């Protein structure tokens, strides 16, 4: 009697696929937690501050020389993880046109820009730990985009003292004048004096009321 063909079940798995999926998730989370990196083009390496659009595209102000090269790489360093390298395509835009709101977002995060050439940075490909990652998998849309402004306002209304406790409790940092400037399911972006800090959530959160609740808990005075 012939042995019937093996039917795959939920316990079957492909280690290569699992490793690839884990690498994509790790890279996406790493990128989400940073708002600056090193931009490499031709023989230049310059600091690059960026923000994300609602659809997950990156936005930055770059020097004019960066616009005239076909090989542009953004490197996201992290002391606790491998470097993430992103191969980019730049798309210039006019800050006085319909996309000017992303310039406003950039300035809320970073202040005044050093360069005046505004571009979208589309990710063609990523690489981390030797694994190649499709760029589309790294441009993650913010499902809280419509609620983001209201969430920032609600959290900032807790007051400076509460936000200082939040940063101290979650990041072990003393921040003089913290301000929440961004919210997505992965965490909060908090502007400090010289940097933008990331306060991650313990798990992805998509309900605004849950985000406000957990933030209030983190920012509450110590009991007793």
Q: Over which residues does each language-model region extend?
A:
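Binding-site signature for planar aromatic cofactors or substrates
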Residues: 1-224
């Amino acid at each position: 009697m012939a042995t019937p063909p093996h039917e795959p079940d939920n316990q079957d798995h492909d280690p290569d696929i699992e490793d690839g999926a884990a690498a994509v998730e790790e890279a996406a989370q790493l990128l989400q937690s940073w708002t600056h990196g090193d931009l490499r083009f031709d023989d230049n390496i310059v600091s690059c501050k960026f923000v994300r659009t609602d659809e997950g595209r990156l936005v930055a102000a770059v020097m004019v020389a960066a616009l005239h090269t076909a090989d542009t790489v953004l490197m996201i360093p992290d002391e606790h993880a491998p470097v993430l390298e992103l191969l980019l395509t730049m798309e210039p835009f006019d800050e006085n046109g319909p996309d000017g709101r992303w310039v406003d977002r950039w300035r809320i995060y970073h202040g005044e820009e050093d360069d005046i050439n505004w571009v979208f940075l589309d990710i063609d490909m990523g690489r981390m730990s030797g694994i190649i990652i499709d760029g589309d998998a790294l441009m993650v849309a913010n499902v809280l985009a419509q609620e983001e402004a209201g969430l920032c306002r609600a959290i900032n209304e807790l007051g400076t003292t509460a936000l200082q406790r939040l940063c101290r409790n979650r990041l072990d940092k003393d921040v003089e004048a913290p301000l929440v400037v961004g919210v997505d399911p992965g965490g909060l972006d908090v502007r400090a004096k010289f940097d933008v800090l990331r306060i991650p959530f313990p798990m992805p959160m998509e309900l605004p009321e849950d985000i406000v609740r957990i933030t209030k808990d983190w920012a509450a005075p110590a009991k007793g």
